[in-house]
Amino acid sequence: MFYSEPMSDRAPTYSIVRPKGRARMSSLAPSRSPYPIGGFPGLSGSLVRDLTASGAVAPEIVGSVAIAAMSLLTQGLADISWPNGQASSIGANAIVVSPSGSGKTVVYNWFMGPIEKYLEHLSAADPEGWHCGLLQEDPTRPAIVQSLDDCPVAGLFTDEGGVTQKLLKDSATLVKLLDGTPLRSARVSTGRIALKEQRFCMLLMEQPDRFDETKPLLGGRKGGVGMVNRFFLVHSTGRCSASALHDVRLSEEVAQAYEERVLECLGVLLEHLERGNRRRPTLSLTAEAYQCFIEIDREARQKCTPASRWFPFSEYIVRHAERVLRLAGVLHVFEHGVGGEISLDTLERAESLANWYVESFAQIFFEPPKPTLAETDADSIAQGILGPCLMGGVYGCSVADLRTAAFNLGLTSTRFTRALAVLCGQGRVRMIRHLNKPWILFDLAYSPLNW
């Protein structure tokens, strides 16, 4: 048995969605908390702890691959109910951005090895069976749609360079597939295909350089394409030595338990598909978890107001509760099967993980505000005129003299006036009246009474 300590007994982690304790974030750029490994319960927690124990691979890489692998195993087994009674698919998608040598392939092999081994066993017994389409490698829309028509539960797991950019042109279709929304008519080479009750998840592993080229196209800030809002994103820059990678492994007990869980999940999925992919069991939240979920959604939406500094990421944050709910469904099914209700503890664990990914998303797509022309001109005056004057022992001058000097910097009278207002507003200079004319003090501690 694999046990997990309740969330209430663990140290709280800070979130921009539901801040706890006295944690503070930078007013300049979003910060990112340590990855909440404790958010994984039971067997999933043992898997993540084993693979991060050596410290060779970043915890966020291990956790993201774990979430994607568990989603592949569980998404076809159950749905989850929203508070209003509507059913939704479970599952999560991840984009892992890290350089070669970061260890993501080693982690991927540990999680996907038992799955691929089982699929090879099924393929040997039945070469034309549904299992041939469970793992997709072709990122083109026709191939994905055709595969889901053959096998309505699938995952696109790939480390092909630039694959994220290739998928963007088909984002409208992919969003429906990721959400589990019916696709009434999709054109493929053999005609048109209608999909219903399909379940699809993605794990995309990218190199930093290729991802940086794609990032502006993803629309992570307000007004984006929408597909990226369905993903957990992680950008890790660390590399580990080749010798350290040899220490990334599962203990014999955990590896055996994981293999058994893979066989169990895929066995149930096989039975479900052989019965014609009928409606899945629908999970619901306990009364306590229900109230917590309402609060999560309410507080996330409060972060999306125009006055909030998180407003640029509001399209991602507004889907925070949805990602929490779908991830909670994954954790519950992976740990407990399709029976019972999702507990408050499971929901809080899913929230702690999803909170971290909100911070990660904001950090990845953060853009410092661009200075206005007046602010740029103010900096030019400070560097080109005020600085040299102070170094030369000049602590002030008339407005007319400063305006004349500003012409040498290419500033017109109008631009100078606006820049001067910025300098005064920033407290870098002070305007006074001296000898019946406007005077500018460069050194605010210097008094004209001493002149």
Identify what each model region corresponds to.
Residues F2-W451:
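Phosphate-handling catalytic cores of nucleic-acid transaction enzymes
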